[in-house]
């Protein structure tokens, strides 16, 4: 509905996920203004963070570590074998769309985000949220971080 709304002049802009917007950007229907995928100031930011319920993490530390390690190894594989990874996704119907667009999007991501970069990004987000009043600014960023994040692995690729 957002795309049609922009085409009809009913809305001027929309916030869309890059994966959703890409086909419309590729065919010239829309132009992106800012992108978490392509803008230089976002390129070192993790797009996603693997999260576990704190009770589950406390009760299953081995599972959490193994899952996180597997997730990290998968990221390294994708980074080093992007086309093969995309083929696996497409063959199993875990991805859909135009192969060239999918490949361009996958090549734009950094799948080897370290714990340190994750920590730095979370501290930036906490500072922004405190600045805008989304979360309490009485606590230090490190205190807030300690409540929401616990690194599982060392920075080993």
Identify what each model region corresponds to.
Residues 17, 35-36, 100-101, 140-141:
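Short loop/turn and capping residues at structural boundaries
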Residues 46, 52, 107, 131, ...:
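Glycine-rich, flexible loop/turn motifs
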Residues 1, 5-12, 97, 135-141:
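A local structural motif
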Residues 32, 37, 93, 97, ...:
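Alpha-helix boundary/capping detector
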